[in-house]
Regions:
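Hydrophobic beta-strand residues in large extracellular and virion-surface proteins
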Residues: 24, 64-66, 82-84, 94-96, ...
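Surface-exposed amphipathic alpha-helical segments
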Residues: 97-140, 144-146, 242-275
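Flexible, glycine-rich surface segments
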Residues: 132-208
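N-terminal "mature-domain start" segment
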Residues: 1-35, 39, 117-156, 270-272
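First exposed extracellular module after export/assembly in secreted or surface-exposed proteins
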Residues: 64-81, 86-118, 139-141, 151, ...
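Signature of long, low-cysteine stretches enriched in small and polar/charged residues
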Residues: 7-89, 188-244
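Well-ordered, non-membrane alpha-helical segments in soluble/globular domains
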Residues: 110-113, 176-182, 230-234
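Hydrophobic, Leu/Ile/Phe/Ala-enriched alpha-helical segments that form helix-helix packing faces
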Residues: 38-46, 115, 119, 180-188, ...
Length: 275
């Protein structure tokens, strides 16, 4: 079900959601759901008069739906689906779905209704500081030195970084890591110097990962040179774990705390071993 794939984080009055490789936010505004209020909220979200606004009858309250594409990088687009909805205070809530491609209207509508009707249990919420994370149904203790850079993206300075999502099927998980790799390859300031498939054991399951080595170049390299981080190793995995379809991207710098035996830093050792 949707709740098995969903994680939520509350931060600065905004709610962040992760599911199926989407990045989603919901925010309540103090403007009433009327023409004047909507005008203000549309302009905050750069929605112009030209943008088509439709009513979605599957949402259980008055609403306007807007979809727009925007550029992520190079020729890679992301889809932005906005639901401007009337909440229980008769004000406007905005639920904004972002995904690189393959959006899922049924899931979006179901989640919007759950958000409006307060049907998401506290178990789906992540702690604001990730001392412990729920990684695809298993609790992992990280201690106090890690932080979220986005929901389901955890950074542990000198110990590695990873992001993950849980998907409705394995193809969607594969698409998610393919998209991340395409975005990485188009980033300015770095270049892919090696790329290969490697055998790994991911959360106890033997599988293949794509291993990519990235070198910084030009001014980026000069800036990073001060901390010694010159090359980044990234692993891309899509696999079924505890009955969940997981996409996961893990990375570390060459000057991180790498265990010479496992060739991995502590965060990555928690979930993967190289064969």
């Amino acid at each position: 079900s949707l709740l098995d794939r969903l994680s939520v984080l509350e931060n600065n009055g905004k709610l962040w959601y992760n599911i199926d490789g989407y990045s989603i936010t919901s925010e309540e505004f103090s403007y009433p759901f009327n023409e004047e209020g909507l005008k203000k909220v549309f302009s905050k979200h750069k929605i112009s008069n030209k943008d088509i606004k439709t009513k979605n009858s599957n949402i259980h309250t008055d609403n306007f739906f807007v979809t727009k594409n925007s550029k992520i990088i190079g020729d890679i687009q992301q889809v932005n689906n906005y639901y401007f909805v009337k909440n229980k205070n008769n004000n406007i809530s905005v639920i904004w779905f972002i995904k690189a491609r393959n959006t899922d209207k049924n899931m979006e509508e179901e989640l919007v209704n759950m958000i409006l009707e307060n049907k998401i249990p506290k178990e789906n919420y992540s702690p604001i500081t990730p001392y412990v994370i729920n990684f695809a149904g298993r609790e992992i203790k990280l201690g106090g030195s890690c932080y979220w850079t986005a929901l389901n993206t955890v950074q542990c300075p000198y110990n590695g970084e990873m992001n993950w999502s849980i998907h409705k099927d394995i193809q969607d998980a594969q698409n998610a890591i393919d998209n991340q790799l395409m975005i990485t390859k188009q980033r300015k300031g770095s270049e892919v110097v090696a790329e290969k498939m490697v055998d790994v054991i991911f959360e106890g399951t033997p599988t293949k990962a794509k291993q990519v080595t990235l070198k910084l170049k030009g001014i980026t390299a000069a800036l990073a040179g001060m901390s010694g981080g010159k090359s980044l190793t990234i692993y891309y995995v899509a696999e079924k774990v505890r009955d969940r379809n997981v996409s996961c991207v893990m990375s570390f710098w060459n000057d991180d705390n790498i265990n010479p035996k496992t060739k991995l830093p502590p965060l990555l050792e928690e979930i993967m071993e190289l064969k």
